[in-house]
Amino acid sequence: MNYLIRFEDDRALSPRVVGQKFFYLAKAFRAGFAVPQAVAISTEAHQSYISHGRWPDGLLDEVFKSATNLDLSKGLSIRSSATLEDLEKQSFAGQYRTFLQVVSEAELKDKIEECWKGAGSQAVQSYLKARRIHHPEEQIPLMGVIMQKMVNAIAAGIAF
């Protein structure tokens, strides 16, 4: 199974496969906006990691290769991309993890695992409960992870 997805891949337009954040980044990229190059690790990889307690066979090598192609040595942003975030009525702002300036394979592996583990965090569970958000199809939100080229911006912002 191919767990890595690029903006051009048809699966990039499935939030259930890549998470909401990568889905919106892919839509912006396809609309012609300047979006830094990125690769998503699919939610299926997260499901496999939870089910088996380890990385899917061969995925770590693929991740390292993709990260090298994104210029890991200059720093990557590792971003959570959950199925339950950036929703119409709930942003989930601050509930999931983002790591900046990741420059080594060891750090990359660690930060991806932290993103995966964050899906089941007490903070996320409390957020879901407080807002009465139910997701009966899974016990915790599915988590994609984004590996994205760093942009060392002078100013940044977000729009809803």
Question: Can you say where each PLM-predicted feature lies in the sequence?
Answer:
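N-terminal beta-alpha lobe that positions the nucleotide/phosphoryl donor
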Residues: 1-146, 153-155
